[in-house]
């Protein structure tokens, strides 16, 4: 019986687990370097992101139609984790003294958002 259950577990499809990616395309403002924006992103990851299950990395295009873009890719374990983190971030914007609002002010001073999308990833 144990062998039959083991075979069934290996052969039958199981639930798919998906990370959720938060992808933001932006351009840096004059006077803001990539290194400056990367520094803000590292602070975000170390403080806010880690506490909310969200980790961001930045991508620079090697080939593409616009090499001036910077792409933010935030990664969470699930859509639920992303939703909870987003609720905390969005609600904190009402308090200009919150950690979130202060980080957002630094991001906004350094970049102009072009687009935003989210994706579930599967392996």
Identify what each model region corresponds to:
Residues 1-2:
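N-terminal hydrophobic targeting signals that begin at the initiator methionine
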Residues 98-100:
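Non-heme di-metal
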Residues 5, 9-94, 105-123:
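Short S/T/G/P-rich N-terminal loop/turn motif that feeds into the first structured element of a domain
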């Amino acid at each position: 019986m144990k062998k039959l259950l083991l075979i069934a577990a290996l052969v039958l499809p199981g639930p798919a687990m998906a990370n959720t990616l938060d992808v933001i395309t932006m351009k840096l403002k004059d006077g803001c370097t990539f290194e400056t924006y990367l520094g803000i992103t590292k602070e975000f990851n170390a403080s806010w992101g880690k506490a909310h299950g969200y980790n961001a990395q930045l991508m620079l295009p090697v080939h593409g139609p616009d090499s001036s873009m910077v792409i933010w890719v935030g990664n969470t374990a699930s859509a639920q984790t992303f939703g909870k983190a987003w609720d905390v971030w969005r609600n904190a914007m009402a308090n200009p003294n919150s950690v979130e609002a202060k980080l957002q002010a630094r991001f906004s001073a350094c970049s102009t958002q072009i687009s935003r999308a989210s994706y579930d990833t599967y392996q």
